[in-house]
Amino acid sequence: KEFLKKANIGSVGHPVECDKDFLSKEDGIAFLAFNKTFPFNCPDNEIAEIVKTTKAENPDDFLIVMLHWGVEYQFHSSLAQQNLAHQIIDAGADLIIGHHPHVVQEIEEYKGKLIFYSLGNFIFDYDRYFLKETLQGLVVGLEIYPEKLVYRLFPVKTHLSQPSLMEHNY
């Protein structure tokens, strides 16, 4: 982690405590990231509290929360993920982007806010593995306006660890 910091590359995941210092802000957009995979779990209540505090300190910022969470190779989010996502939105997040399961999971709208549970894989050396779904992922394009959020999905596929766009974007 020290090497990444010296190279000015942000990272999350700490074996003992939540990374409370991973906040990036620029041009009215705030970004928080948390790890929810063993053994680097940040407790749900701490995540919700950090989100709440961040939103209170930056009420006009569009707050994006990224979560490394979920169960690998599961095509649907778990009840625990859904409960945490709702807590995070209730605490003030404007958008949640998740990853870790290595497959794309559903998108939910909760109280007018979007939750991308898992974007699947983008660049990952899974060419020799058993599920074709691990060779697929999503890139999310965002346009953030004061009154609305516009997004586009760009499906990607990977071959020999090289991502490329699929034919259709949504």
At which residue positions do the language-model features occur?
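Acidic, metal/ion-coordinating pockets
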Residues: K1-Y170
